[in-house]
């Protein structure tokens, strides 16, 4: 990993509890209960204000001073859970812990076990503390909490056999042939239903009619994962979930690039086809067509210099996609790199001579920005406005988290997230805002 540098800087990232924004819509009949301080509640109300007023399936249990001296949070938490049950009637409740819970050493796991027994349905703890996790790793914590509900074996079904005598059997019944257990494919990641349907359709056209997804919208219909399962991650930040699947289920986790951009989607599909012995000849034409559809946007991006400061752990796949667009990625900063799950992405970026910085130091990045003079900086929300004031054009990294960016069909939405800020800056300059001092 000679091209990966580490600077041990602080994470400039959203809090992991914000992952409820997409998870509460993915897992039906669920409720996400966040346990934290007034500051955490204010963050959720500010960041997800539209969803809060839409009466979404998440809420807050605010820690008070009396909770600091309480022997156990079970009783107080139980009162909040009862309110949730009365109003929402969920089939599963996820209790998301925050930094405050970690600092106070509150044992929510024991409380959740007691509450699961009391209410008769799963109350699952998930560690979403921002102390050692980045924004998107909240999804990893929730999926990891769901793994015990993933079956190891499919429900037994009695086969209906039609007995027919074989030729030259002389009336003797032949011995039953033992069939090898079939391998199944499971895609892992909480992406939108339309994205899943597109990927399932692509794989069906290539010869895989059945493709399961984890998480399923219904907790009672999770796919089987065992030693016969091939697991393929859709997101680069599911490390704990994948490690547990390898260790406890003995499933094969396919190491490939992520289906982000036409190039990534093509390699993703090819890796699955090769694993299952399927023909890959049709994939190249699909990729070529996707690139042709992007040509107007590619003309805007070619030759531009783009820098990632690091926020949502999508930086490496996005940087790989941009290099395929003839963009010079001057630096790909990211909070954390799990080399085992990102092996293919790292190899491609090294081949393309992209500087990769793990846990970057923001002060040093500011100095490098002055040297690079990038055309676009991809950064977290809290950093973008100050950078704009310094004369840099920025893109919000959070937009890549919420947008549909996987697969061939969504490639146009992905590339527009990069071209839109560039076009905005160009329009401002054409209207004379640069002369007024708004832009340098």
UniProtKB/Swiss-Prot annotation:
GO MF, one example: oxidoreductase activity, acting on iron-sulfur proteins as donors
One Pfam family of this chain: Oxidored_nitro
CDD domains named in the record: Pchlide_reductase_N
Keyword check for Nucleotide-binding: yes
UniProt key word Cytoplasm: no
Entry EC number(s): 1.3.7.7
Gene Ontology terms: biological process: light-independent bacteriochlorophyll biosynthetic process; photosynthesis, dark reaction
Enzyme class at the top of the EC tree: oxidoreductase
Its job: Component of the dark-operative protochlorophyllide reductase (DPOR) that uses Mg-ATP and reduced ferredoxin to reduce ring D of protochlorophyllide (Pchlide) to form chlorophyllide a (Chlide). This reaction is light-independent. The NB-protein (BchN-BchB) is the catalytic component of the complex.
Recorded family membership: Belongs to the BchN/ChlN family.
UniProt-recorded name of the protein: Light-independent protochlorophyllide reductase subunit N
């Amino acid at each position: 990993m000679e091209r990966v540098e580490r600077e041990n800087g602080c994470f400039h990232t959203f809090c992991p509890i914000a992952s409820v924004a997409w998870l509460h819509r993915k897992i039906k009949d669920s409720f996400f209960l966040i346990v934290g301080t007034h500051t955490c509640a204010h963050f959720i109300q500010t960041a997800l204000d539209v969803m809060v007023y839409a009466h979404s399936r998440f809420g807050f249990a605010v820690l008070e001073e009396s909770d600091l001296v309480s022997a156990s949070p079970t009783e107080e938490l139980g009162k909040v859970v009862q309110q949730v049950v009365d109003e929402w009637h969920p089939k599963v409740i996820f209790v998301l812990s925050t930094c405050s819970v970690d600092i106070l050493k509150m044992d929510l796991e024991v409380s959740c076990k007691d509450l699961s027994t009391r209410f008769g349905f799963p109350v699952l703890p998930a560690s979403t503390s921002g102390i050692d996790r980045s924004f998107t790793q909240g999804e990893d914590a929730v999926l990891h909490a769901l793994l015990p509900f993933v079956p190891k074996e499919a429900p037994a079904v009695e086969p209906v056999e039609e007995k027919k005598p074989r030729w030259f059997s002389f009336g003797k019944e032949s011995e039953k042939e033992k069939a090898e257990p079939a391998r199944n494919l499971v895609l892992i990641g909480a992406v939108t239903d339309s994205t899943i349907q597109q990927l399932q359709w692509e794989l069906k056209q290539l010869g895989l009619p059945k493709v399961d997804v984890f998480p399923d919208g219904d907790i009672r219909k999770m796919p089987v994962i065992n030693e016969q399962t091939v697991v393929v991650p859709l997101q680069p930040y599911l490390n704990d979930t994948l490690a547990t699947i390898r260790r406890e289920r003995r499933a094969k986790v396919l190491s490939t690039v992520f289906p982000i951009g036409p190039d990534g989607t093509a390699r993703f599909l090819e890796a699955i086809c090769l694993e299952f012995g399927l023909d890959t000849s049709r994939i190249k034409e699909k990729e070529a067509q996707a690139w042709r559809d992007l040509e107007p946007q590619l003309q805007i991006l070619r030759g531009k210099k783009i820098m990632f400061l690091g926020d949502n752990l999508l930086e490496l796949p996005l940087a790989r996609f941009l290099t395929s667009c003839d963009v010079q990625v001057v630096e790909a900063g990211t909070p954390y790199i799990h080399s085992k799950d990102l092996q293919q992405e790292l190899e491609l970026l090294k081949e393309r001579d992209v500087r990769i910085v793990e846990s970057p130091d923001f002060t040093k990045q500011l100095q490098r920005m002055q040297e690079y003079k990038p055309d676009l900086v991809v950064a977290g929300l809290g950093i973008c406005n100050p950078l704009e004031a310094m004369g840099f054009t920025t893109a919000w990294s959070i937009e890549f988290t919420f947008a549909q960016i996987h697969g061939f069909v969504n490639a146009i939405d992905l590339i527009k997230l990069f071209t839109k800020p560039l076009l905005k800056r160009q329009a401002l300059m054409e209207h004379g805002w640069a002369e007024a001092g708004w832009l340098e």
